[in-house]
Amino acid sequence: MKKQAITVISTALTCFLLSNVGHAQEKPKQYYTVLLKDPSKFEQGITEIKKENGEITYTVPEIGLIQFKGDTQISKNQSPLFESVNPSLQVEKPEVPHSIKMPNLSTLSTKTLDTNLPPLWDMQWDMKEITHNGESYKKETGSHNVVVGIIDSGVDVDHPDLVKNLIPGSKNFVPKGGLRGTEPEETGDINNINDINGHGTLVSGSIAANGELKGVAPDTGIRAYRVFGNKSADAAWVINAIIEAAKDDVDVINLSLGSYYVNGKVYENGKLVDNGWAEVEGYKRAIEYANQHGSVVVASAGNDSVNVANKQELNNFLKQKYEKEGKIFTGVGIEAPGELPGVVTVSSTGPTGQRSVFSNYGEGVIDISAPGGDYRLWQQYGEEVWWNTGLFRQEEVLTTFNTGRYLFAAGTSMAVPKVSATLALIINHYNFKNQPKRSISHLYKNGIKKDIAPDKASLGNGQLDVYNAIK
């Protein structure tokens, strides 16, 4: 069972705005998040915040979440409407490790004999493994009747491998001015889903590429829900995107992101930072909302090689992270949204079938694993040999990238979309639309390798097998 009683303070992957001691006129206004006890009292909550001179900056009325800017933090005790109040949390923008622009395809030496498979197929060790060398495509490739919503940095709308499956209805959640007004290039246009970062395009290719590359579900519809510009995102944007994707009748919601939180207290410069769990409770409410509206939510386990089920190990990891930031904490850490109820949590494996060296793990946390690449060869031979001899092609996964390019990358972010795409195939193949529990149960029972007894801490219910999921 996944942990459900959560208090959020801060995280190594999440930025935290802390209030400072001093006179109000001597410090800039800070951003705070309020979660209401009863979302139906949303307008009353807005009124209460404005009474305290709070400037409303972002809202998610469906779950009673409000972000405001103010001189001082409002205590949750100031109103019986407030469940929690804390400095607003940010989710750091996802990192894109490096891009490799592939050579002209006509110069590639390829052994691909099946004319139904694309020219770069021989470089897709991950897809060959989970599709039984493309056999799953003969059974099911998906349709636009089933949609995967990708909450990320947007998508390259002109990428030739993706354009056929990018269906209408994508949305931008980065507001005008971007993060706290620091991105003047962000206009707040709801239709701006252009991927500046590139991470969302990487994820999209693993799901629905259908060109020089092939994704798991090459005829499945995708929508981009853009929450990252050039900088980090407020967690409220991600929460809002989950809600909106569910309202848009998205079948599978892909979250190739995650952060660390603490159930306890955090101190900075000897000062106690008030406890708060608005964003984590907001995530929980949004995920429950999505499940109730028929959407499956899939999230990554994280990339720090930590046993997140072992709270002592996780706490030691977070302690080291916090010390670098001049902070100390007491309490218990958690990875979210991966550890939250109602989420399919994915770890990463490499070409050997072992858990990737970077992947988080933990029995009772990991639900399933999928190929996301590895760095064992990099560790064995060193970076120079790994690059110069092309060893990276043997363990990183190839996917789509911005401006029509392709990229070799690794991370749990590359494992999650394969599971999301497989769920989309299951929903389409078995007509499981609006039946998230049934779809997930089928995945865990059938969509895994049958000949391998899984290490539950690393692989959960097992290693993803797309062919088995739909045969």
Residue ranges of model-derived segments:
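Mature extracellular/periplasmic domains of secretome proteins
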Residues: 138-143, 214, 233-255, 277-300, ...
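Sec-dependent signal peptide cleavage junction
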Residues: 18-28
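Structural recognition of the beta-strand scaffold that forms the well-ordered cores
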Residues: 33, 67, 147-151, 205, ...
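Active-site core segment of subtilase-fold serine proteases
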Residues: 114-206, 210-218, 237-240, 247-248, ...
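Positively charged n-region of N-terminal signal peptides that target proteins for export
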Residues: 1-5
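Extracellular S/T/G-rich loop segment that most often corresponds to the catalytic His/Ser-adjacent loop
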Residues: 322-424
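Autoinhibitory propeptides
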Residues: 24, 32-122, 351-354, 361
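C-terminal subdomain of the subtilisin-like protease fold in secreted/lumenal serine endopeptidases
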Residues: 250-257, 261, 428-471
